[in-house]
Amino acid sequence: MSSEVRKVEKPWGYELIFAHTESYAGKILHVEAGEALSLQYHEEKDETLYLLYGEYDLTLEVDGELVTRTVHEGEAFRVQPGTRHRMVAGPQGCDIVEVSTPELEDVVRLEDRYGRS
């Protein structure tokens, strides 16, 4: 039995939400070249990100400091609740698979180039 895939437009690209149950969520983030998600953290949401296509710069909080590194196809990272993070797509854009707990609206934005709060 298939489930509905929902497309959600974002200022940086779009999300394809392919699963959202009371236990987990799954989506693909399509980020256009050079576009960025907000610097953010989640109070409850626990997520793992897998880079399917392209590359991106990941800024991730490590021991209280923000560290940035380039992520390449096939790499995965876990982002636990309370961890500040941001993704900026490389010159080809990127597609990221996100698997998480179900709290999709749990986003605390700290900085956002599109003026969202």
Q: Which ranges hold each PLM region?
A:
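Short, surface-exposed secondary-structure edge patches
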Residues: 28, 48, 68-69
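Double-stranded beta-helix
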Residues: 3-10, 88-117
